[in-house]
Amino acid sequence: MKLIQSGSVDKVKEALEGDPSLADYRDPQGLSALMWAVYTGQTAVRDLLLKKRADLGIALDVFEAAATGSEAELHSILSKDAATAQAFSGDGWTALHLAAAFGTPLSAGSLIFRGAKVDAVSQNPQRNQPLHAALALGRNSSTMELLLAHGADPNATQVGGFTPIFSAATANRKDLAELLMAHGANPQLTDDQGKTPADFARERGHEELAIWLEVQPA
């Protein structure tokens, strides 16, 4: 896993040539080498592992397919067993969380169509919902629109009392804050420490956004 985190494609390729079974290596939580590449943002290593696994005939699971935007594989998995749309990974995410964070709107849509719950709470310390994941990492407005259109709560809280708009404020994304507010997000809600999204924006140097957030109605 350290080799993957290093981002060295050549070294990973060399390791795979020496032991092809490493393409399907999983840690004690069941996380594959592929998911580690996704989590650490090593896109070149991710693509190398995807190709190697395809060459070896190693199928993706629903979480890997969702996180890598592998639409054909995801469709095949869900067609055979729609219940996987509501399953949790070894580290506590649903496939919809992963699609929202790392995948594509099409992947998220396929999962919702097959019964994935937009209000599923992760079974890990974050205790968040797919919309939180979309704001924290993916920040794809189309994915957000999809989740909100299917009933995602824009004021849902995760651990710490953070609603999705806190992530928009942190990232200086007024457009995403506006999208959330158009669906009912309250920009004046506070986290467990009594801070508002405007406070988060200001602490990160986004003064213009902070001022704008402060004058928005609750």
Annotated model-derived regions:
Residues 1-27, 68-90, 95:
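N-terminal segments that cap or nucleate solenoid repeat domains
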Residues 14-21, 47-55, 78-84, 109-117, ...:
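Ankyrin repeat domain, specifically the short helix-to-loop turn at the C-terminus of the second helix
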Residues 1, 26-33, 57-64, 87-95, ...:
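Ankyrin-repeat boundary/"N-cap" motif
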Residues 2-8, 36-42, 64-70, 98-104, ...:
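Ankyrin repeat A-helix N-terminal signature
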Residues 11, 44-45, 73, 106-107, ...:
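Conserved ankyrin/ankyrin-like repeat signature
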Residues 155-195, 199-200:
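Ankyrin-repeat and related helical/solenoid repeat scaffolds used for protein-protein interactions
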Residues 2, 47-67, 76, 80, ...:
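Ankyrin-repeat-protein effector appendages
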Residues 100, 117-145, 158:
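Eukaryotic tandem repeat interaction scaffolds
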